[in-house]
Amino acid sequence: YMEMCIDATDEKINRIFMNTAEKKEIMEAVFQAGLPIGSMSVSALTKYALGDPDEEIRKKAMQIAEKSIELAVDLGVRTVMIPGYDIYFGESTIETKKYFLENVKKIAEIAEREGILVGFETMENNFMNTTGKAVQYVNMVDSAYLKIYPDAGNRVTPLLQLRISS
């Protein structure tokens, strides 16, 4: 299957606002290719972090998350991945972790309402760089619609960088 990505550029973020005709065009291409879109990565949530101290950025993050889940429903995507960052551009603090958890709980409610699985993508940062750390948040949220989507590449990359630099 294919994966769709909602990157942090305005052009890619605008995908979540597709009209019906644009969605139909994608579905026709998917049908013709015989290759469904099985997952969606919402990496725009690095720029617009769920735990950002700035309330406006958090609001934008939640809009992106909700519209991404709604788009997933329309396109038949089963899993939406969100990055395991409380904040990407800034310092992780008790406050950013609190905001992150609050917003992930809201996302889990949206996912349940829409019938879409959301998975934490494990990342290369200390916040959620292991499945064990991701499990802690999954347990705190306690939703059947929030899971883990481990990305082995994010575990290997730091090791490769060490090897290349030595």
Positions of PLM-derived features:
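Short acidic/polar active-site loop segments enriched in Thr and Asp
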Residues: 1, 36, 78
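Glycine-rich, proline-tolerant flexible connector loops at the mouths of alpha/beta enzymes
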Residues: 3-31, 84-91
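Short, glycine/acidic-enriched loop or turn micro-motifs at the edges of active sites
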Residues: 6, 10, 124, 154
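Glycine-rich, phosphate-binding/catalytic loops in enzymes
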Residues: 19-20, 136-137, 165-166
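Conserved alpha-helical segments that form or flank metal/cofactor-binding pockets of metalloenzymes
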Residues: 29, 34, 38-40
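Active-site acidic/histidine proton-transfer and metal-coordination neighborhood
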Residues: 31-32, 46-150, 157
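Flexible loop/hinge segments that line or gate small-molecule binding clefts
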Residues: 43
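Glycoside hydrolase catalytic-domain groove-lining segments
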Residues: 158-166
